């Protein structure tokens, strides 16, 4: 029996095959917005997340335009959009809708295994592509990272443990994302940020913390560990007031 990640990657292979049958990448170049610049000060990357394998439906019928507008008005430094349909109920249409509404950097949050997915994300308006070390061979990661650069985009290279971190460091990526969620079990442990953050601070690399941040205390914890930003999804998608959440999570350390 495979892990959740195995099942997701198997589904992605089917989606990639379908994309090659139905989608022709556009050749046009466009301007992009920089997450690296946004991370010059500690910032929140606010996520549009309808559902997840671990939580089921979170906010299935969210108004993406309204949500993204609220994120930007409340001071988010970037917006992340889940584009996976099978497991997270997202879509590239959600990404495109977010682009139409937002003037800040936009992350395509998906399980990228092929260049054609990057082409599709680029066309939908992404500025940043998530590359997950756990989902890729080292050779494929190198190929996709190079393609992200070729497209004029930025990458977040995501890691969960020391072994993945050592692979990511070799690429000297724009941003490293420490995912506190184990994608094989979907369990969350915020201490991963503190463990792996020490190594990244030594290397003087730009990094963010992903998953498991629900409160001001969590925000303080990851900032003290050295993170330059934090990706928040579920907590914002279930909040009765996005404005109040941002106010509560303002940290000055």
Swiss-Prot record:
It catalyses: 1-(2-carboxyphenylamino)-1-deoxy-D-ribulose 5-phosphate + H(+) = (1S,2R)-1-C-(indol-3-yl)glycerol 3-phosphate + CO2 + H2O. It comes from the Bacteria. Gene3D superfamilies: Aldolase class I. GO terms for molecular function: indole-3-glycerol-phosphate synthase activity; phosphoribosylanthranilate isomerase activity. Keywords: Amino-acid biosynthesis, Aromatic amino acid biosynthesis, Decarboxylase, Lyase, Tryptophan biosynthesis. HAMAP family: IGPS_B. Belongs to the TrpC family. This is Indole-3-glycerol phosphate synthase. It comes from Bacillus cereus (strain AH187).
